[in-house]
Amino acid sequence: MQEGDYEKAAEAFTKAIEENKEDAIPYINFANLLSSVNELERALAFYDKALELDSSAATAYYGAGNVYVVKEMYKEAKDMFEKALRAGMENGDLFYMLGTVLVKLEQPKLALPYLQRAVELNENDTEARFQFGMCLANEGMLDEALSQFAAVTEQDPGHADAFYNAGVTYAYKENREKALEMLDKAIDIQPDHMLALHAKKLIDPS
Protein backbone atom coordinates (compact mmCIF):
# COMPACT_ATOMS: atom_id res chain seq x y z
CA MET A 1 0.00 0.00 0.00
CA GLN A 2 2.81 2.42 0.92
CA GLU A 3 4.29 1.91 -2.54
CA GLY A 4 0.95 2.75 -4.16
CA ASP A 5 0.29 -0.78 -5.50
CA TYR A 6 -3.35 -0.92 -4.49
CA GLU A 7 -4.27 -3.97 -6.58
CA LYS A 8 -1.63 -6.11 -4.88
CA ALA A 9 -2.67 -4.73 -1.50
CA ALA A 10 -6.32 -5.55 -2.24
CA GLU A 11 -5.36 -9.13 -3.16
CA ALA A 12 -3.34 -9.51 0.03
CA PHE A 13 -6.12 -8.11 2.23
CA THR A 14 -8.80 -10.25 0.52
CA LYS A 15 -6.67 -13.35 1.11
CA ALA A 16 -6.14 -12.35 4.76
CA ILE A 17 -9.92 -11.94 5.22
CA GLU A 18 -10.58 -15.37 3.68
CA GLU A 19 -8.01 -16.98 5.96
CA ASN A 20 -9.10 -15.14 9.15
CA LYS A 21 -12.85 -14.59 8.87
CA GLU A 22 -13.22 -13.96 12.60
CA ASP A 23 -10.34 -11.46 12.82
CA ALA A 24 -11.25 -7.76 12.64
CA ILE A 25 -7.79 -6.55 11.54
CA PRO A 26 -7.90 -7.67 7.86
CA TYR A 27 -11.30 -5.98 7.51
CA ILE A 28 -9.85 -2.75 8.96
CA ASN A 29 -6.85 -2.94 6.61
CA PHE A 30 -9.11 -3.45 3.60
CA ALA A 31 -11.39 -0.61 4.75
CA ASN A 32 -8.34 1.69 5.04
CA LEU A 33 -7.39 0.75 1.47
CA LEU A 34 -10.94 1.44 0.19
CA SER A 35 -10.98 4.75 2.02
CA SER A 36 -7.65 5.79 0.48
CA VAL A 37 -9.06 5.23 -3.05
CA ASN A 38 -12.28 7.09 -2.17
CA GLU A 39 -14.53 3.99 -2.08
CA LEU A 40 -16.23 5.48 0.95
CA GLU A 41 -19.42 3.41 1.21
CA ARG A 42 -17.54 0.14 0.80
CA ALA A 43 -14.97 1.31 3.36
CA LEU A 44 -17.75 1.96 5.89
CA ALA A 45 -19.19 -1.52 5.26
CA PHE A 46 -15.81 -3.10 6.05
CA TYR A 47 -15.33 -0.95 9.17
CA ASP A 48 -18.82 -2.05 10.29
CA LYS A 49 -17.90 -5.70 9.73
CA ALA A 50 -14.69 -5.24 11.74
CA LEU A 51 -16.69 -3.71 14.60
CA GLU A 52 -19.18 -6.60 14.52
CA LEU A 53 -16.22 -8.91 15.12
CA ASP A 54 -14.50 -6.66 17.68
CA SER A 55 -16.49 -3.80 19.21
CA SER A 56 -13.32 -2.48 20.89
CA ALA A 57 -11.39 -2.00 17.62
CA ALA A 58 -10.45 1.66 18.09
CA THR A 59 -8.79 1.94 14.66
CA ALA A 60 -12.07 0.91 12.97
CA TYR A 61 -13.97 3.68 14.78
CA TYR A 62 -11.21 6.14 13.85
CA GLY A 63 -11.18 5.06 10.20
CA ALA A 64 -14.97 5.30 9.97
CA GLY A 65 -14.79 8.75 11.56
CA ASN A 66 -12.38 9.91 8.86
CA VAL A 67 -14.71 8.61 6.15
CA TYR A 68 -17.61 10.56 7.67
CA VAL A 69 -15.43 13.70 7.69
CA VAL A 70 -14.80 13.29 3.94
CA LYS A 71 -18.58 12.85 3.49
CA GLU A 72 -19.08 16.01 5.62
CA MET A 73 -21.25 14.02 8.06
CA TYR A 74 -19.73 15.65 11.12
CA LYS A 75 -22.12 14.39 13.79
CA GLU A 76 -21.50 10.78 12.72
CA ALA A 77 -17.75 11.51 12.60
CA LYS A 78 -17.86 12.91 16.14
CA ASP A 79 -19.66 9.78 17.40
CA MET A 80 -17.03 7.53 15.80
CA PHE A 81 -14.08 9.52 17.14
CA GLU A 82 -15.60 9.49 20.64
CA LYS A 83 -15.98 5.71 20.41
CA ALA A 84 -12.32 5.42 19.31
CA LEU A 85 -11.37 7.45 22.38
CA ARG A 86 -13.47 5.24 24.67
CA ALA A 87 -11.88 2.16 23.08
CA GLY A 88 -8.48 3.39 24.29
CA MET A 89 -6.99 5.21 21.30
CA GLU A 90 -4.73 8.02 22.50
CA ASN A 91 -2.94 9.85 19.71
CA GLY A 92 -2.65 13.42 18.52
CA ASP A 93 -4.44 12.80 15.22
CA LEU A 94 -7.56 11.50 16.98
CA PHE A 95 -7.70 14.48 19.34
CA TYR A 96 -7.13 16.85 16.41
CA MET A 97 -9.88 15.26 14.30
CA LEU A 98 -12.34 15.28 17.20
CA GLY A 99 -11.52 18.92 17.89
CA THR A 100 -11.94 20.00 14.27
CA VAL A 101 -15.24 18.12 13.94
CA LEU A 102 -16.57 19.90 17.03
CA VAL A 103 -15.50 23.22 15.46
CA LYS A 104 -17.46 22.23 12.31
CA LEU A 105 -20.45 21.50 14.57
CA GLU A 106 -20.04 25.02 16.02
CA GLN A 107 -19.00 23.77 19.45
CA PRO A 108 -15.59 25.48 19.84
CA LYS A 109 -15.72 25.40 23.64
CA LEU A 110 -16.02 21.59 23.57
CA ALA A 111 -13.26 21.43 20.93
CA LEU A 112 -10.73 23.30 23.11
CA PRO A 113 -9.53 20.44 25.38
CA TYR A 114 -9.18 18.05 22.43
CA LEU A 115 -7.13 20.51 20.38
CA GLN A 116 -5.03 21.32 23.44
CA ARG A 117 -4.35 17.60 23.93
CA ALA A 118 -3.48 17.22 20.22
CA VAL A 119 -0.85 19.96 20.61
CA GLU A 120 0.50 18.40 23.82
CA LEU A 121 0.91 15.04 22.09
CA ASN A 122 2.46 16.52 18.95
CA GLU A 123 4.01 19.94 19.50
CA ASN A 124 5.08 20.16 15.85
CA ASP A 125 1.53 19.84 14.52
CA THR A 126 1.11 23.43 13.32
CA GLU A 127 -2.43 22.86 12.04
CA ALA A 128 -3.62 21.53 15.42
CA ARG A 129 -1.92 24.47 17.13
CA PHE A 130 -3.52 26.93 14.68
CA GLN A 131 -7.01 25.48 15.28
CA PHE A 132 -6.35 25.58 19.05
CA GLY A 133 -5.44 29.26 18.72
CA MET A 134 -8.62 29.93 16.73
CA CYS A 135 -10.76 28.28 19.42
CA LEU A 136 -9.02 30.27 22.17
CA ALA A 137 -9.68 33.50 20.25
CA ASN A 138 -13.34 32.55 19.74
CA GLU A 139 -13.67 32.05 23.48
CA GLY A 140 -12.15 35.49 24.16
CA MET A 141 -8.87 34.08 25.53
CA LEU A 142 -6.88 36.55 23.44
CA ASP A 143 -3.43 36.42 25.08
CA GLU A 144 -3.46 32.61 25.01
CA ALA A 145 -4.54 32.70 21.35
CA LEU A 146 -1.71 35.10 20.45
CA SER A 147 0.78 32.81 22.12
CA GLN A 148 -0.42 29.89 19.93
CA PHE A 149 -0.41 31.99 16.72
CA ALA A 150 3.16 33.10 17.53
CA ALA A 151 4.22 29.47 17.97
CA VAL A 152 2.57 28.57 14.63
CA THR A 153 4.42 31.34 12.75
CA GLU A 154 7.68 30.32 14.41
CA GLN A 155 7.17 26.73 13.23
CA ASP A 156 5.83 27.79 9.81
CA PRO A 157 6.89 31.36 8.86
CA GLY A 158 4.73 31.12 5.71
CA HIS A 159 1.44 30.56 7.58
CA ALA A 160 -0.46 33.64 6.34
CA ASP A 161 -3.67 32.73 8.18
CA ALA A 162 -1.86 32.63 11.53
CA PHE A 163 -0.48 36.15 10.95
CA TYR A 164 -3.94 37.32 9.82
CA ASN A 165 -5.65 35.92 12.91
CA ALA A 166 -2.93 37.35 15.15
CA GLY A 167 -3.62 40.72 13.49
CA VAL A 168 -7.35 40.47 14.15
CA THR A 169 -6.68 39.42 17.76
CA TYR A 170 -4.38 42.42 18.31
CA ALA A 171 -7.12 44.63 16.81
CA TYR A 172 -9.56 43.28 19.42
CA LYS A 173 -6.97 44.17 22.06
CA GLU A 174 -6.86 47.67 20.51
CA ASN A 175 -3.17 47.34 19.70
CA ARG A 176 -3.37 49.02 16.28
CA GLU A 177 0.36 49.04 15.56
CA LYS A 178 0.82 45.32 16.26
CA ALA A 179 -2.39 44.48 14.37
CA LEU A 180 -1.10 46.25 11.24
CA GLU A 181 2.32 44.60 11.57
CA MET A 182 0.72 41.13 11.63
CA LEU A 183 -1.68 41.91 8.76
CA ASP A 184 1.22 43.24 6.65
CA LYS A 185 3.09 39.97 7.24
CA ALA A 186 0.03 38.00 6.10
CA ILE A 187 -0.21 40.15 2.95
CA ASP A 188 3.55 39.83 2.26
CA ILE A 189 3.15 36.05 2.29
CA GLN A 190 -0.13 36.04 0.36
CA PRO A 191 -0.72 39.32 -1.53
CA ASP A 192 -4.29 38.31 -2.45
CA HIS A 193 -5.31 37.47 1.16
CA MET A 194 -8.71 39.19 0.92
CA LEU A 195 -9.50 38.98 4.64
CA ALA A 196 -6.16 40.53 5.61
CA LEU A 197 -6.50 43.27 2.97
CA HIS A 198 -10.03 44.07 4.17
CA ALA A 199 -9.01 44.09 7.85
CA LYS A 200 -6.06 46.38 7.09
CA LYS A 201 -8.36 48.83 5.27
CA LEU A 202 -10.72 48.89 8.27
CA ILE A 203 -7.87 49.60 10.71
CA ASP A 204 -5.94 51.98 8.46
CA PRO A 205 -8.25 53.55 5.82
CA SER A 206 -5.35 55.69 4.50
Curated annotation (Swiss-Prot):
TPR repeats: 1-23, 24-57, 59-91, 93-125, 127-159, 160-193
Gene3D superfamilies: Tetratricopeptide repeat domain
Top-level lineage group: Bacteria
Record's keyword terms, sorted: Repeat, TPR repeat
Disulfide-bonded cysteines: none
Function (record text): Could be an interacting mediator in the complex formation among RNA sulfuration components, RNA processing components, and aminoacyl-tRNA synthetases.
Subunit structure: Monomer.
Name the UniProt record assigns to this protein: TPR repeat-containing protein YrrB
Species of the source: Bacillus subtilis (strain 168)
Lineage of source species: Bacteria, Bacillati, Bacillota, Bacilli, Bacillales
UniProt gene name: yrrB
